[in-house]
């Protein structure tokens, strides 16, 4: 294959995947600094930024950590960096962004003060505040704590992932270091009290750090910090575990237990630890000193999701939030619109756009299919389900009514594994057939097939979408869901489910583009048509909206199209490894990223000519 980028450093046109993701997360962080966004929504964006960063370190840095051990010389195909180089670049980038997060938190605290809400600084307390804090520590916190001494007689404890600790260096009689560690995950992250019509927020970590000396009696503290551990969460399942005689659900349960004890990939401190403490912890936790990151603001920012409800339980402060937006029900099948779902779909395709539309029409369709005598089976691929899922309940109801219900449930949906294990049990007990996908691929498709027998002929209702079958996230993500009785779509969906039941991937389709065999070749084919259109004097146009772009073959094809004169517009929310507007290569490529109230999640491809 002719090289598309022969005479230019690849780093000028391609971006490292991990650093591109960090730029995306920086865009999330920037929303928390936007004064036009309501206060509590800004706090939520800041919490999302830190939550994203936690997951990034657990998964992506965790994966690079593994690669640095197993394949230390493997290079990134876009920038030529090995795993160790990428980790160094990530840590440097994290340190560069940290002051921006600090500024965002300070701006939110300032606005909270303007709203008569104070984040207490324990170094500057009034006498009354001091009395309240002292009482809270003595009566509410101290009885629940279990301080631990770490020395030659007391072994180093296991430090759980994403949990914070007070770590203190205690005065020692010899040169050996003596530590005091106080776990406090069992305590609430903050305490709120009222004084003189002002609300005061007190962070548990700050209180414990302030009173640390009281926890260790006569042993004098030489230095003290809040510390937080991040562990690798990039578990992989060996394909041998899919053997016929293996209980894959049980294997995944054991893998989740293993995840909790994987290697440490990040150590966060509230202040700079001394050299002796750093060296001791790095040795015990087997991490490099460059994995120590400092943050003067709260290390665990998960409190930001719950704090708005604690401060305003009835949402009386309308100015603190985005205006309320309720999903619209375009067709209320349950109330007889269109003569019911199945009747309506005989004459109309239905395109739902979330979060603007409700998931109700799809749930109504499943419930109606459960009771319709013409329906033979319901087959569906499930990735992430909501708690108390109406969709799962509808599938269980259909099985209980005697329908054949096949659920392809992906147990490896990251951080939803346990939820999916629980749903697998529930669906099986209702009578559904549950299979767990393929050894080499995650089943990420959002596909549902309802098969009917009408006048001795097989007819299909097919739903294909970009979003999970999850009523909760459908109100937070922009997604598309297309429902049709198109026979070709139904036949393709049948092939997909038949292949999955055989442990295979579908290798040919007529209407649906199904990865890994049918999707990328079709994208390449249609871009090639636009290239040929331009070369024959016509105008070529490509529009792509996706979550991420990092596939080298597609990026090189887009560069080739740009060089041919094809106008290319892309909306890419997250990772984007292609630089637009590089002279001679991507001149005709324009890329935007949308970050806002809703998480952009729909995928759209438009090929205009050719």
Where in this protein do the model-derived segments appear?
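Cofactor-pocket helix-loop regions in the catalytic cores of large enzyme subunits
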Residues: 547
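N-terminal localization/anchoring segments of enzymes in phospholipid and broader phosphate metabolism
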Residues: 1-542, 560-564, 574-600, 604-610
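Hydrophobic alpha/beta core scaffold segments
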Residues: 567-571
